[in-house]
A protein has these predicted regions:
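Phosphate/nucleotide-binding beta-alpha loop and adjacent structural elements of enzyme active sites
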Residues: 1-248
C-alpha cells in the first residue's frame, strides 16, 4: 500500500514536488515531538545545541537537520548547510522559506580533497529515488542503478577559512567522511566543535577515531537520550547510530 501511494504521488507531483510534500510532513511531525524513538539523534539536538551556536550541516539533503539546528541556535546563531544535489537543494530552499529559516546559508557544493567537478549518484531501487543514499561515485563503481549528476567539490578548510566561530558539525556523507575530514582539520583544530557523524563501515570508524583523538576528542554513543563514553574498540564495533566526538 505504501509503495502504491508513493508511486501515485510521484506520478502526480513529480520528484521534486513529492520530496517537498514528504519533507514538509516529516518536519511538521517531528517538530510536534513525534517519531523520537525512530530518530533519537534528531531529538537529541535539543540537549547539545545552544542559542547563538554556529553549526555546519554536511550532507544537508532536504533540510531535516538544518531546520532543527536553525530553530535551536536562534536568530543570533548560524547554520552553514552543505548540499551539492540540485534537486535536494531546491527542496531545501522550499523548506527554509516555508519555515522562515533566516539564519541558514546553503552551499550547493560537495566537500573533499580538491576544488574540482565530480560525479555523484543516487540509488533508484524499485523505482524509488533513495535520496538519503546519495554519494560521490568511485571511478570503478557500477552506476547502472543510479541517477547520476555532476557536482562541484570544494576544500572545506578553504570554504570555512573566514568563519569566526564554530560549535557543532553534523556529517552524513555515505562513507565519504574519510576523504573529507582530513581537509577540515584546520577548522576543527581552531574551534574544537562537537561533531556528530554517521559512519557505516568499520574501517571508516577507526580512521575517523584516529584522526580526531590526537586533537583531544573523545568518542560517545547515544543511549537512552544521553551520551555514553566509547573506547576505540567500542567505536570500531559501533552500529547503534551516529557517533559523537567532543573534547572534555
Amino acid at each position: 500500500m505504501e509503495k502504491f501511494v508513493r508511486s501515485i504521488l510521484l506520478k502526480t507531483l513529480g520528484l521534486e514536488g513529492y520530496l517537498a510534500v514528504v519533507s514538509d510532513a516529516y518536519l511538521r511531525v517531528t517538530n510536534a515531538g513525534f517519531l523520537k524513538a525512530k530518530y533519537p539523534e534528531l531529538f537529541f539536538l535539543k540537549k547539545i545545541i545552544e542559542p547563538n551556536f554556529v553549526c555546519i550541516d554536511i550532507g544537508a539533503n532536504v533540510g531535516y537537520y538544518s531546520t532543527n539546528l536553525s530553530r535551536l541556535c536562534g536568530a543570533n546563531g548560524k547554520v552553514y548547510a552543505i548540499e551539492p544535489v540540485p534537486l535536494f537543494a531546491n527542496v531545501f530552499k522550499r523548506n527554509a522559506h516555508k519555515f522562515a529559516l533566516n539564519n541558514i546559508t546553503l552551499y550547493q557544493t560537495a566537500l573533499g580533497a580538491e576544488n574540482k567537478n565530480i560525479e555523484m549518484g543516487t540509488p533508484v531501487i524499485d523505482g524509488v529515488f533513495r535520496h538519503g543514499l546519495t554519494h560521490v561515485l568511485d571511478n570503478d563503481e557500477n552506476n547502472s542503478q543510479l541517477a547520476t549528476f555532476e557536482a562541484e567539490m570544494k576544500i572545506p578548510d578553504e570554504l570555512f577559512a573566514n568563519i569566526s566561530k564554530l560549535d557543532f558539525i553534523k556529517c552524513d556523507v555515505e562513507g565519504y567522511e574519510v576523504h573529507l575530514f582530513p581537509h577540515l582539520l584546520n577548522t576543527i583544530k581552531k574551534f574544537k566543535p562537537i561533531i556528530q557523524i554517521e559512519i557505516s563501515s568499520t574501517p571508516n570508524r577507526n580512521e575517523i577515531y584516529n584522526l580526531l583523538a590526537p586533537l583531544g576528542y573523545h568518542a560517545f554513543g547515544l543511549k537512552n537520550d544521553d551520551l555514553i563514553a566509547l573506547t576505540q574498540t567500542d567505536v570500531i564495533n559501533y552500529t547503534l547510530g551516529d557517533l559523537y566526538f567532543k573534547t572534555i
